[in-house]
Regions:
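Glycine-rich phosphate/adenylate-binding loop and adjacent beta-alpha elements
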Residues: 1-46
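A glycine-rich, Thr/Ser-enriched phosphate-binding loop motif common to dinucleotide/cofactor-binding enzymes
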Residues: 28-34, 50-73, 86-94
Length: 255
């Protein structure tokens, strides 16, 4: 049969999302795909990129598509733009790869000097260790020549948003794709107004956007960064490994 990947929102084809919850999301509102076999409607899947392994393709429906939508669909990234990624998780690494391939300059934050070295080896222009630099947003702003970044792929939420705003240029674009630091908190509204920023909330993407991303991947040399693969029976250990934040890129299950 065909080599396929699932959709995060099976009933979201294009245009406006028909739902504001995860009631039809596999692995959330309905049973997911941590199984050997599954029966689902054909239109709940798209073709996987030609030549990709199953592990590689499995990284696309959530992390890959979120990064694609953040930068390409919503951010309308162009060559020469400055992009800030936070950390080295799956979405951030995909954002790094997409941004570099499109001719942008990438900046990053990370929690360790070891990860900082790895990021620089991938082509990142500059890295700030946020455990050593509390005001990392101001530091990134200075590193861009006091201009600020055009795009921030914001994964932290209330605990990092103020720093992402500080790192941004006037008229910049922040895509909020995660809330790792909490679901609510203070928002520096005056700073948003002063910098005339656009802040867009994004939850993955639709079928049409996933197909666009896959077409792009088939004509580039981008492949996902897979940190570690766990057998299905060690699924709990996989989640614990993710929780500890030691990974770079994606963690996969071998079914």
């Amino acid at each position: 049969g065909d080599h396929v990947v699932s959709l995060f929102f099976p009933n979201w084809v294009k245009a406006e999302c028909p739902q504001a919850d995860f009631s039809y999301t596999p692995g959330d509102g309905i049973d997911g795909y941590a199984t050997s076999y599954v029966v689902r409607p054909e239109n709940w899947f798209t073709h996987a990129p030609k030549g990709w392994t199953h592990h590689e393709a499995a990284t696309l429906p959530t992390a890959g598509l979120t990064a694609w939508r953040a930068l390409v669909v919503e951010g309308k990234i162009k060559a020469g733009d400055d992009v800030l990624i936070l950390g080295t998780g799956g979405v951030s690494i995909f954002a790094l790869q997409f941004a570099l391939k499109m001719g942008a300059r990438v900046w990053a934050t990370t929690s360790s000097n070891e990860k900082a070295k790895w990021l620089l080896e991938q082509g990142v222009a500059g890295v700030v260790n946020y455990r050593e630099e509390e005001n990392w947003g101001e530091k990134i702003f200075e590193m861009t020549g006091n201009r600020g970044v055009d795009h921030v792929v914001e994964i932290g939420g209330p605990g990092t948003l103020a720093q992402s705003i500080a790192a941004s240029r006037i008229g910049g674009h922040i895509t909020l794709i995660g809330v790792f630091t909490g679901i609510s908190g203070d928002v520096p509204t005056a700073a948003i107004m002063a910098k005339q920023l656009t802040i867009k909330g994004v939850t993955v993407g639709n079928r049409s956007e996933q197909q666009d991303m896959i077409r792009a991947l088939e004509v580039t040399d981008i492949h996902p960064m897979i940190d570690k693969v766990f057998p299905l029976e060690e699924i709990q250990a996989a989640f614990e490994y993710q929780r500890d934040g030691k990974h770079i890129g994606k963690i996969c299950l071998d079914v």
